[in-house]
């Protein structure tokens, strides 16, 4: 156990300074408060654990997080919600044991107070208050741990605010009538009863507590129980407050006491709703995989590919601007009809002695479903030294016995394992056992004969015919998706168990989805080279225009290298001639390349040739590869991005062999090359004269489990067409904000160097942040980012708008049409009713979808001191979706976010190193 007298003590130092000022403010106050002056103890749960003074004379140390959180609480007026009692250190105790920055500041504060001890009492009071203010300001400039901002809360309820919902509505655009995948939930009574459950003798094992309480299930038909706290929709009679249960393991008697604590508003209990709908899914006989539930009885067979598709639903309940709603979306899971064992046998026949290496590539990291209980497991390794004949320890009737996998499955599931010599699949998991503070590692052994693979392999994904057949059932139209919602609502209403479960909590589900009014923003005009102006189209695409007109800013390709193997020589020559033939209409000049034929297509052959031919005068390297190989691609990118920095393009020779498409493919490659060399393709009207727009996204490196790659991309010209990029490597447990601050300072410095002035306005689009991190971002990361401004000048204070981008959402929006429902056009905005209750947020459909159902993107404005209106924020966001140069149309997220995604993926998947500073002002990662 850690010494309680150790720690950094920043927050505790601040607390002690505050307490001292309070004593000075009321010198006549007795050391022990009178009962009248003590705030009334609240029945609300405490968010701060109580502390007791050390009797040994050592003052309380620690990191001081709880003390930091107490600062605001101590200043509350009597009668407000109070924390648990905090007992301060004895006045005779030794100095604080912290060693942090806050403690050093406190020491300086005490020294200054001692030197000025002769000052009048009134001056002392004001001086202490001033010192606290200075101390607070200094501490706000330090990198306080993000954990200090987190407060432990009961997972079953949340704070209910009496404030009205945050309403930020725009007006620009054409109103349209839409429906969405939200369903109103209505409740008769807004009360839940909370009870504490005690066991005598006490039971440490949480699972046993559930069993003991469930012996009296007739009294708790509708309940939520976490092992200690019981929530029920009605008050329990006195007769069921004291019960007796029987321990199923030793037949001993256990007294169960149920003690009333308080009533809660039903709107606090969002968790109860979500648990309830999980139970309703069971009532509907659906099988749970993660957060989704699937109907195995409605499985769609695709026999030609040995696949089956399970339809299902994903649900979530929350309180939105328009009230309490259920979010419902249809989903699908692809499974293989063959077992893992049959796949192993196929690989053994084709690969022979190398079967294990091939199966390792296929299985490691894949998810398999056990056929006997329909559970998912991640495969970590294959153990060919184990088989179903192997034994393991199992507890039976209090005794440990050895049992083989063959006997175990026959005894528990009635399954006869046919192949007794098959290897076992190993899945590793970590769980916290009852009564233990440290997690325990588990090794789960799986029988291949009893497992089905889920999902698709890379080979299957590259099979066009297979993917087309699968998409027939998974990419469902808006009409099909809406029909699935209606079917779900009808199933719940017709299922007596589900209906009674809802009625038990006083709930009912609306018979149809939520209808509302959305807006479609006007199309954006595009600007190309030679002052060409192209009006925007409703579908927000300009594929034909991008090759017809000159690019906005062309970079001529004068000195470049073309690598290819001898067998691809003709492909390379055809590509070169097509490139030179089609470059003039785009306004780009292309000179002859330095040709580098290679003897073979080995990875080291490409690497050696690149290192030899790349010199300081080379603008560009293009490598044509015979086949698609990830290791070769990664090696080429590692050389060109980090070791010998130069813009590079890798082309699969097969894509250039189609003579009917070589012209269009070459044109797209030429556009990419222009961007990688620092050119721009098109632009749109930007309303701000001096602004910098930033995109941030992360990628979790699969080869390094504990490391993530975060990319930072920032504009550095007025038209938002030139981009500066940096990469941060984040180790596990490391705070990313320190790296982001460095990136922001570097980007602002580059902006100053390019424009002669700093931007007046900074807009940050941050991807990869979930709902649970919004408060932390708002209270911790954003203040840290604002500190960067003073580094570039004491008077530099630009406005800051911080927008979180969420694209992995379940929201769907459907346009009402003559034929039922369609996807809404790009530019459709929803900013009310189904938006977050307590956040300034909106949804935008920014891209055109020709197959399936479009998914909008959710934007949460977590901070804004610029004063821009909701209309301006929404239109700017939609404008930025037009500037991604890898696609002649709008994309789902703002261009800087998409650029950041491309960069982090390239570095995390291939380069695994910091790209060279030579490339930071170019889109080398496209």
Swiss-Prot record:
Residues annotated as catalytic: 697, 735, 767, 901
Alphabetical GO biological process terms: cell differentiation; meiotic cell cycle; secondary piRNA processing; spermatogenesis
SMART domains: PAZ, Piwi
Compartments, record wording: Cytoplasm
InterPro entries in the cross-refs: PAZ_dom, PAZ_dom_sf, Piwi, RNaseH-like_sf, RNaseH_sf
Stretches for region Disordered: 1-62
Compositional bias (Low complexity): 26-56
Domain PAZ span(s) in chain numbering: 339-455
Cofactor(s) recorded in Swiss-Prot or TrEMBL: Mg(2+)
Annotated GO MF terms: endonuclease activity; metal ion binding; RNA binding
CDD domains cross-referenced by the UniProt entry: PAZ_piwi_like, Piwi_piwi-like_Euk
Reported tissue expression: Highly expressed in the larval testis, pupal ovary and adult eggs.
Domain annotation Piwi: ranges: 620-912
Single GO cellular component term: cytoplasm
Entry's family note: Belongs to the argonaute family. Piwi subfamily.
Role noted for this protein: Endoribonuclease that plays a central role during spermatogenesis by repressing transposable elements and preventing their mobilization, which is essential for the germline integrity. Plays an essential role in meiotic differentiation of spermatocytes, germ cell differentiation and in self-renewal of spermatogonial stem cells. Its presence in oocytes suggests that it may participate in similar functions during oogenesis in females.
Protein's name according to its UniProt entry: Piwi-like protein Ago3
Organism: Bombyx mori (Silk moth)
